[in-house]
Amino acid sequence: FEDLSLGLSESMSHTITDADIKGFAELSGDRNPIHLSEEFAAKTFLKTRIAHGIYTASFISALIGMRLPGPGAIYISQSLFFRAPVRLGDTVTAKVEVVELMAEKCRARLACACKVGDEVVLEGEAWVKVPSRLPRPEKAA
């Protein structure tokens, strides 16, 4: 917790592949044909397959768990607003930024967003419990 400050941010990018979409469908059990069937998707207003929204959101989880705050961080809550679809071949850039710190509870509020190019496709906020550095035991003289 002591290493966090307002405005601190981290980001990562990932290009969505067919294997990503199929793998997430298998893991999650969400086999909605909008994700898996070009024939089905072509008949919808979207005209093509899209990635699962929660798969896109998982990049935020990866940032929180691995980079900011990082290992040991525990989700308390997450709000998500899906603004636009993510398609096969899109490169998603996820970003989290510290916008509030609650020192007494070792909690942080993070603004979260995913973009494809300049378009925000997902946004929201997360509250996380952040590990505090434990005091080091004093060495015996």
Question: Can you say where each PLM-predicted feature lies in the sequence?
Answer:
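Hot-dog-fold acyl-thioester-processing enzymes
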Residues: F1-A73, P135-A141
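HotDog/MaoC-like acyl-thioester-processing domains
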Residues: F1-L6, V86-A141
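Generic structural detector for well-ordered beta-strands
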Residues: S11-T15, F81, E97, W127-K129
